[in-house]
């Protein structure tokens, strides 16, 4: 059946077995090329590579080969080259359908068997090169992903940019927010396995940010002004997808709690827990309840903290076995312990990561 044709071969998984007389016209032999004649996968082909005979389903064509004229592999590569033409010639309604006549009327150039062998060898040589390139591409993409992770590791442990002893210690930044601030102790978080520079400090998200979540959708409460809002389906890593925006009513008190302004850091509460992006648009928007809004209590480099969330996500420190449980509640987020460098170093780190990531993204785009 068509479902047995997979990845250029024929699989015997989930075959239907019958008993009774066999019409020789429908016998499939080792080396036959089968083609889907109808349906969504019209033109799909696979070589039958078993010694046991099989029977042909009515929606599957069988292209046998006269070995005195054609090599099996030459036939296979020729038919692959005709795939687009076969689809173009197909007819039918909602789904394409290929007749036996379309297949039998295809013109095929037939060189000598010796020349066919050379053609097949040349094709397979170039296919081998292509496979090497594809495998190299996959390997390079893996290296790029690991490199990005390593860059974040270095950044969050204070090893990406040089330490400047003249920088204001991070604790002074925290004391401007709260004169009674005391650094946190990260020792009871077993997954945080790195030390930070002497002029950095361990703090919580609640020490640095004003934190709110959005409004839960409630169709039974129509009070308020209809305003645009975004959900987690609009929020992706470092970007927003705004092609579909919904509206719901917000009261005056809800507007202040749920409004997002340029520069706010937004975090997913559920789904891909911890997924984050900075709202960088010149207009405001509202958020639904499954998004956390973080707004710095003083001047901070929000992009540094965005990359911090990316690092924590990669190391399962949010939404995993570490700092938080599955689903990032307001309490979990408020108490999340983070490394805080000086303000200047926050900007230096974020700029360096932006630069390195942009170069790696350029390489990825060229693959």
Residue spans of the language-model regions?
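Extended, domain-scale alpha-helical bundle/helix-rich regions
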Residues: 139-189
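Short coil/turn segments at secondary-structure boundaries
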Residues: 12-14, 89-92, 162-168, 185-190, ...
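Interdomain signal-transducing alpha-helices
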Residues: 75, 116-119, 305, 313, ...
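A short beta-sheet element
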Residues: 1-2, 19-79, 92, 99, ...
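Non-catalytic DNA-recognition/assembly elements of restriction-modification systems
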Residues: 105, 109, 113, 117, ...
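Sequence-specific dsDNA recognition surfaces
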Residues: 3-30, 187-191, 206-219, 233-262
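Short amphipathic alpha-helical signal-transduction/dimerization elements
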Residues: 79, 83-87, 309-317, 357
């Amino acid at each position: 059946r068509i479902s047995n044709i997979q990845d250029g071969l024929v699989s015997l998984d989930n075959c239907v077995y019958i008993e009774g007389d066999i019409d020789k016209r429908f016998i499939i032999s080792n080396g036959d090329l089968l083609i889907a004649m109808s349906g969504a996968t019209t033109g799909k082909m696979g070589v039958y590579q078993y010694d046991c005979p099989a029977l042909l389903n009515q929606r599957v064509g069988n292209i046998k080969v006269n070995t005195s004229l054609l090599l099996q592999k030459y036939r296979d590569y020729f038919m692959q080259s005709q795939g687009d033409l076969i689809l173009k010639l197909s007819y039918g309604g909602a789904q394409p359908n290929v007749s036996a006549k379309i297949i039998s009327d295809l013109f095929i150039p037939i060189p000598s068997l010796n020349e066919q062998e050379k053609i097949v060898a040349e094709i397979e040589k170039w296919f081998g090169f292509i496979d090497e390139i594809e495998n190299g591409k996959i390997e390079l993409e893996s290296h790029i992903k690991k490199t990005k992770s390593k860059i974040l590791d270095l950044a969050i442990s204070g090893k990406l940019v040089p330490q400047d002893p003249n920088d204001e210690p991070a604790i002074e930044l925290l004391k401007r927010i709260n004169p009674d601030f005391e650094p946190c102790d990260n020792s009871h978080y077993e997954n945080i396995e790195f030390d930070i520079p002497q002029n950095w400090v361990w703090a919580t998200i609640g020490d640095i940010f004003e934190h709110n979540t959005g409004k839960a959708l409630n169709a039974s409460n129509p009070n308020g002004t209809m305003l645009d809002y975004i959900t987690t389906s609009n929020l992706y890593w470092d970007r927003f997808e705004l092609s579909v925006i919904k509206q719901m009513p917000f009261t005056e008190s809800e507007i202040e709690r749920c409004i997002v302004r340029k520069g706010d850091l937004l975090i997913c509460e559920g789904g891909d827990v911890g997924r984050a992006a900075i709202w960088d648009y010149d207009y405001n928007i509202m958020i639904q309840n499954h998004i956390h809004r973080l707004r710095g209590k003083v001047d901070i480099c929000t992009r540094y903290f965005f990359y911090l969330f990316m690092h924590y996500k990669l190391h399962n420190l949010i939404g995993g076995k570490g700092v938080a449980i599955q689903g990032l509640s307001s309490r979990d987020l408020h108490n999340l312990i983070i490394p805080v460098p000086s303000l200047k170093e926050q900007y230096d780190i974020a700029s360096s990561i932006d630069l390195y990531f942009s170069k790696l993204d350029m390489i990825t785009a060229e693959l």
